Each structure stands twice: as C-alpha cells, then as structure tokens.
Design a protein with these regions (language model features):
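Conserved alpha/beta-hydrolase "acid-adjacent" motif
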Residues: 79-85
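Catalytic histidine neighborhood in serine/cysteine hydrolases
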Residues: 94-106
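Short beta-strand/loop motif that positions the catalytic acidic residue
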Residues: 67, 73-75
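Accessory cap/linker subdomain of secreted extracellular hydrolases
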Residues: 1-66
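Catalytic histidine-centered segment of alpha/beta-hydrolase-like enzymes
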Residues: 105-114
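Glycine/threonine-rich phosphate-binding loop and adjacent beta-strand/alpha-helix elements that clamp
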Residues: 92, 115-117, 127-366
Length: 366
C-alpha cells in the first residue's frame, strides 16, 4: 500500500482508519499506522479492514484448486480459528488429500513430532513408489477430546451429525427446552465493559448445562444465535465453550467470534449450524435496537463425560491472561473494543438465544 499511494493519500487513509476507536485505543496498531516503515505487512493488514481483493489474492483457500500435488493437512484443536480455515482449505483441494486433527495443546514442536512416522510412510509412497497402504487409510482423522478416541471418516465431519439447540435460560442455564415466558418475566442478562485502556477486568456472562448423564459426543462446527441490544454502534461478541469436570477443572473446547458491525450473513452459504459471514463491509448497529447476531462456532471434536458440564462464556474482549490465554503468545487475541459498551442479552420466548451444536448420531445396536 505504501508503494501504491502518495504520502498525502497514505496520511489521509491512516487518519480515516484511526477513526475506529478499537484501532486508535490499541498502542501497537496506533504505532504501526503512524510508523509503517519496516512494518509494511502489518500496515497493509490493518488498513484492509474488510475482506476483498487484497485478501482474496493471498487466500490459500482461493489458491487451493490450483494445487495438483498430494497434500496432508495437520492441525491441533484449541480455539478453533485455524481449524476452520484448514478444513475449508481441505474442501477446496482437488488432488489427493488427508486431514488430521490432533489433540488440544500443549503440542510438540512443528512439524508435530508425534506425526513423524506417518510422514515417512507418505514420503515413501509418493516419492519412492512404495505401496505401503497409506492411501487405503481414511481421509479424515479426528482426535476427540474427553473420550480421547480417534474417529475417522471419508470427509469432515467424519460422522453423521444432527445440529441441535441448547437455549440460554434464566439463572444462567443452558437447556434443550426454550424459555416459555416473555421478557417481562425473563428479564435479559447483561454486562458493561469498560475499555481495556482503563481496566484489566474483562466482564463475562456464563451459562451451563446440567451435568451430562451419559457420554455425549459432538464433532463439527456450530452456531450461536444471540438476541442482543447494545448502546454503541459496535462491539465484539466472544464465546468460549468449556468442558467443566465435577471437580471444577476446565478445558477449552472451542470459541466463536463476531464483530457486531459484521453481522451480515451469506444467505446462500449459511445453513443450520453452519453460518458464513462475508465480512465485506461494516454496518454500524443502531444503539438500543435488539438484533439477532449469529456467531460461527468453530470446529471441534469433544465427548462430554457423565458428570461434566458444558459451560458457555460471553464477553466482548478476551482476557489478556487467564488459565487458557496465559499459554498464548503476546497479542494472540482479537482486538479489544475501544469504547465503553453496555450489553443486554435477551433469552425469552420472543428472543430464543441459543447455541446450535453438532451432536453425532447414535447408530442403533443390532
């Protein structure tokens, strides 16, 4: 971008970009925009705030159909963002391909040490012509958290799934049954978040299921439908899904993220439990209006064991350091909201806020 525009045009574009309070409030981005020399890659990313031609010409998914050599994709579970792109890339490939989804970190060095023997077998087949049966193996392999089993199949997800809703209810409950009463009785939940420039505390709402009574397996992606009202033109909606054990220990299962101004859906691609957002423009929110926001729950594979609970947390920022984020590199989180925002989350008969998850179908025993 620095080469494509005059200094005067760059200055004008930077000033416009800094009108976004999220960008202006974050020191690293403010510095990059004002001193782009030697930070050209970051500068271009920050300046291209919505999807479009600049990203498409660099998008591996767009380029994937041109690849005609064998591809083996490996990704480990965690927050789910990179899993989603890896799976989409796998779908776009036309040649021989394999997808392995490994366990939750801590991971080994990359390439993953535990996969070395498999790599050697693939090299022997494709480079040396040794018929060792590697191509007879299933195309998709998924480590399922909780049960710690490996599930294989010909595609993603490797099992048939049924997307079923769990509804947000009063008293912070998640239930298969929707709330039967109106907002006059089921008053909304809510939270106020000050910018992280003035506080270190990230406000969090949570809802949880009753303890599971039998092993419950979920593999795939999902959706969260939130009926929300905010008092600003924009905010973030950040969900984190946890497997909580009877003793209180927790493991992150997956996440979902949506900037409120990017709430538009690609209606042609979106299906139940599988939403797509084009991210090609930002549409400010009308403060005080109740909107339905549909978040994409990133892919995961997990079995909730008897006695465990599914806990869903909602915030508009990611905690800079907690039991999970403390393990991540600096700035490995979404850009915090730079303005104070009050959020109301409606979950009543007229506003069925819910999370739609990929329950695997049980095959009847013969």
């Amino acid at each position: 971008m620095l080469e494509a525009y005059s200094p005067e045009e760059i200055e004008e574009r930077v000033a416009k970009r800094l009108q976004d309070p999220d960008v202006a409030a974050w020191p690293n981005l403010f510095h990059v925009l004002n001193y782009p020399k030697n930070h050209e890659a970051w500068f271009d990313i920050v300046m291209n705030e919505v999807d479009g031609e600049w990203y498409e010409e660099r998008n591996p998914v767009t380029l994937a159909p041109n690849i005609d050599i064998p591809v083996w994709l490996q990704i480990d579970q965690g927050r789910g963002w990179t899993m989603d792109g890896t799976i989409e890339l796998c779908h776009a490939l036309n040649g021989p391909k394999k997808l392995d989804i490994g366990p939750y970190p801590p991971m080994q060095s990359r390439p993953f040490v535990e996969e070395h023997d498999k790599m050697v077998r693939r090299y022997e087949y494709w480079l040396k012509g040794i018929d060792n049966g590697v191509m007879d193996e299933p195309a998709v392999s998924v480590h399922v958290e909780g049960s710690r089993e490996t599930v294989t199949g010909a595609q993603w997800p490797p099992k048939d799934v049924e997307h079923r809703p769990l509804y947000l209810r009063t008293r912070r409950a998640l239930s298969p049954e929707p709330e039967p009463t109106g907002a006059e009785y089921a008053a909304p939940d809510g939270f106020y978040q000050a910018p992280l420039t003035v506080t270190d505390k990230v406000e969090i709402l949570s809802w949880s299921t009753a303890p599971f009574t039998e092993p419950t397996e979920m593999i795939g992606q999902g959706a969260a439908h939130l009926f929300a009202e905010i008092d600003q033109p924009d905010t973030n909606f950040i969900l984190r899904l946890w497997d909580e054990a009877p003793g209180g220990g927790r493991q992150l299962i997956t996440t979902a993220y949506l900037k409120a101004s990017h709430r538009e859906l690609d209606e042609e691609r979106t299906t139940e439990g599988d939403p797509y957002h084009p991210h090609t423009r930002a549409v400010p929110v009308e403060p005080g209006r109740i909107e339905e926001y549909v978040l994409r729950v990133y892919p995961f594979g997990a079995t909730f064991l008897p006695g465990h609970k599914l806990v869903v947390e909602l915030s508009n920022d990611e905690p800079p350091a907690d039991a999970h984020n403390a393990l991540l590199p600096p700035d490995a989180f979404h850009l915090p909201v730079g303005r104070p925002v009050t959020h109301k989350i409606y979950r009543d008969a007229a506003h069925p806020s819910r999370i739609v998850l990929p329950f695997t179908r049980t095959v009847p025993s013969s």
